[in-house]
Amino acid sequence: MAKLTKRQKAIREKVQAGKAYSVEEAVALLTELSAPVKFKESIDVSVNLGVDARKSDQVVRSSTVLPNGTGKTVRVAVFTQGANADKAKAAGADIVGMDDLAEEVKKGNLDFDVVIATPDAMRVVGQLGQILGPRGLMPNPKVGTVTADVEAAVNNAKAGQIRYRTDKNGIIHAPLGNVEFSAEHIKQNLEALIADLKKIKPSSAKGVYLKKVTLSSTMGPGLLIDQNSLAV
């Protein structure tokens, strides 16, 4: 049997199996147990939803602008033209174009984290589905990345908008910040996400909707969250 590392021992000693933690307790523990690595460990959430992800009408897919952002610098590419191109640039888009941008994508130049497109640009973007789709970059109106209001879309992306979709097990995965965030900021971000998830509950979903909420860090354990500690 392999020996436990110091960190694994610390996790085993400090994490109480089955305990539901408040967000403040969870963030304090994840920060205490964070690894001595050269990057800031992110703090992420997994939300188990009471949906049947095999049914198309119970797939939960949307976006949320986190009030305190994610702590990450987001590079935004926008497919548009004319006046909208000027608006996108003014809002802070990093790359703006149409056919020229599509050619760069086809060459493998994907130096961006979010792709936004105006409806008229989808004729161009549609050709890039096999490249953008597997990377989770394909614009979609359900998450606000196909829109005529490019200014708002760019602002939201830069402000820390997260996009999510239930996986095959009906679980949402999303970033909430990093170990340098205060517990209050993580809590506010989580509450914003939970509030949005409640708004988009599929009408056909039966029983308990928010089944389990778990916080974790990049290298750390998953901690069950006491939903009664959330103000939503």
Swiss-Prot record:
One of its GO terms (molecular function) is rRNA binding. GO terms for cellular component: cytosolic large ribosomal subunit. Disulfide bonds: none annotated. Keywords: Repressor, Ribonucleoprotein, Ribosomal protein, RNA-binding, rRNA-binding, Translation regulation, tRNA-binding. One of its GO terms (biological process) is translation. The keyword Transmembrane helix does not apply. InterPro entries: Ribosom_uL1_bac-type, Ribosomal_uL1, Ribosomal_uL1-like, Ribosomal_uL1/biogenesis, Ribosomal_uL1_3-a/b-sand, Ribosomal_uL1_CS. Coiled coil: none annotated. Part of the 50S ribosomal subunit. Binds directly to 23S rRNA. The L1 stalk is quite mobile in the ribosome, and is involved in E site tRNA release. Belongs to the universal ribosomal protein uL1 family. This is Large ribosomal subunit protein uL1. It comes from Hahella chejuensis (strain KCTC 2396).
